[in-house]
């Protein structure tokens, strides 16, 4: 089994780190005839397995064709371990037979074995047999294997060369792919390592549960993310089996050899419109690592600040220090409009976070192998050194920014702006009753790449962000929905916070609308809602915890009505604290009656 195996890439590296984990997961069996300390590999970042976990096992000697390796004699030693991925018991056979995996270095004991439970193969690099030191390297998923690998005879069989990288499955594979997976997994669907890739409609439905409005942006992002991970899946499938055919009628047989480039995304919209939430929710739906970076903190190399490689380190940490998982993640770079050449040309100093940072980001966006340094105080030191190699060709980069006054650039390009004061297009739209936000949204719908270049981004940077998504400012109705409807709505969050103290929080309809109007007046979008709620509920949150011991006079409910909110230009009296039983309904009815009377008076005043 050792001679015939040839692996082209590693999926992930799992290093033995925890003594408690080792004593639970690894039971090593040593020979009675073996010397106590046999160096197997050159010393590296070794980790000690406690000697209490050792048992003994007789050495086996394999000669002739005993391992499929000619007529030379090779030593073998067997150990029983628990799989690092699924904890199922598996056999590991160490041998000094040369492997193609390690350049056929002679005299080195090593092992490549397969877990029948999770269909994963591991290459074990021991540095000493007693005490056992080394690390597991996960090679990948194996297709077309039998479940019965517990017998000693199976340990001597050759591994199949048809490797399947863990990833995503698209619906286009149909029933053939399902049958193939069932066969490779022994018919047990719970063991399937390939998860289904959601369709664009399913992704959009997932976004609807958390994000209000921005319907066009949701569709564009859903298609972009689906195509990105479909591209990754088909690329990994093609690598997994060069002999696979996709059973698709194609006019051009050479289309199988076409390489698909990734398409990164640029989100444009005012603050509080949902750019960050959209990117974060997308990563949650497709279940990939997600990292956020602020472009304003990035600087050129050798300057004080964060290098662009720090973005990849954040993604590496979010992926649980798994390089392979990180290489399929999503990175959101916020405030990219702040690193335009225009914003730094007026400073008079060196442009350390403008065009230079854009140049540094080009290779990351396009796709390249980057050496990512590990900080000295990092969460986990990589055993291979002070840096890791990450390939960014499958990382989806989503950039975002407010791009203030970009609509003026669009208007000038359309020759609708007059020299000096005013613009005819804005005048026409304003006289038609459209708000300023509606005017901006209408202009940005016709945004082109040349407008971003005129704004201050370099052409090479814009060219690597082919998908442009414009978001509009949220209106009053949408802000009310943000407060009440999504799964993680702000109103629901504060209700849960008070419920932890057995207190009921209630908002009247008039109060929620007034809160939305106050947020719109601050031009902060949905971000302004939390600060408004904090100011309204601060006094109640201060009083509630101490009222638990007051018995029947303890606080039972907190009411937020229009009086608590105040007006658009002035603060209110704060949330009303209600004590005693059965008082909330009475106050709610009174508050709603007052609000209805005010609405009726306002309507009568407008009609006169």
Curated annotation (Swiss-Prot):
Binding site for ATP: 270-277
Listed GO biological process terms: proteolysis
Targeting presequence: 1-66
Keyword Acetylation attributed: no
Record's subcellular location: Mitochondrion
GO cellular component: mitochondrion
SMART domains: AAA, ClpB_D2-small
Xref: PANTHER family: ATP-DEPENDENT CLP PROTEASE ATP-BINDING SUBUNIT CLPX-LIKE, MITOCHONDRIAL-RELATED (PTHR48102), CLP PROTEASE REGULATORY SUBUNIT CLPX2, MITOCHONDRIAL (PTHR48102:SF4)
Family according to the record: Belongs to the ClpX chaperone family.
Main function: ATP-dependent specificity component of the mitochondrial Clp protease. It directs the protease to specific substrates. Can perform chaperone functions in the absence of ClpP.
Protein name as annotated: CLP protease regulatory subunit CLPX2, mitochondrial
Species in which this protein is naturally found: Arabidopsis thaliana (Mouse-ear cress)
Organism lineage: Eukaryota, Viridiplantae, Streptophyta, Embryophyta, Tracheophyta
